[in-house]
């Protein structure tokens, strides 16, 4: 019989930059930047696993930053993917460091748990490490995120794409919610997209809106494969996707300079797996392993 893998927690505590001109009004914030973290999952996480650090005083607003400082800071981020600065990128950076600063604080805590698994998969497939911040704009690091278009999980897979990469969805399991399996599937998908486009900005756009829409934008842009030439021909939300990705890399690197404190996290520093060869209820597993059932559910969000 096929083994079922359940995560169990060990509670151990826890390129050159160029200023470009792009019309700002063509951009739209990705859905996760506009939505509140109000799902039952994040409600439980925030009440039980993530909390404010009493020793860190987060400023209500960050300092004013000049364009030249933004350009300099972006140039110092070690990256293979180009991170240009323009007015659209600036708008996204100021959103993350301004009205979304509490969300950033929350994501910094969750990142301690998720980033190691992202980094392992990216290193295995020899992909740019800065892609580990893609789920920041995809799902705000919510493994049970569900978009209006029914994209699901940390990496926001649509059902058809997820099945192409071996993720299972049925009455008992939704593997798009599985942090490990969805991460490895997403990295394989990104690798395949790069083999098609050979340009990381186009890969990011295709990941968000699909290769068909990117190919259509290329035709409408007269055959150009420069992302900023394609920009006005992309779907509205995708126009803000690359700027949002650049801003996510910026804020996850320079949050201290903007007076943003990471929340403290009791998410496990290390987890392990138990292989089960027959049907069991999670409550049975929790009882045998002496683990709180809600924590077990949070570590295994793929099970319905």
Give the predicted meaning of each segment.
Residues 263-293:
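Primarily a LysM-type cell-wall glycan-binding module
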Residues 236-258:
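Catalytic cores of secreted or luminal carbohydrate-active enzymes
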Residues 234, 299-304:
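Extracellular LysM carbohydrate-binding repeats and other cell-envelope/extracellular binding modules
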Residues 92-106, 140-148, 156-198, 218-232, ...:
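Substrate-binding clefts and substrate-entry loops adjacent to catalytic sites
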Residues 88-91, 106, 110-113, 117, ...:
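Extracytoplasmic/secreted proteins, especially bacterial periplasmic and envelope-associated proteins
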Residues 18-125:
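An acidic, Gly/Ser/Thr/Pro-rich helix-cap/linker signature
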Residues 127-144, 203-210, 296-300:
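Short, functionally critical alpha-helical segments immediately adjacent to catalytic or ligand/cofactor-binding
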Residues 1-24:
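Bacterial Sec-dependent N-terminal signal peptides
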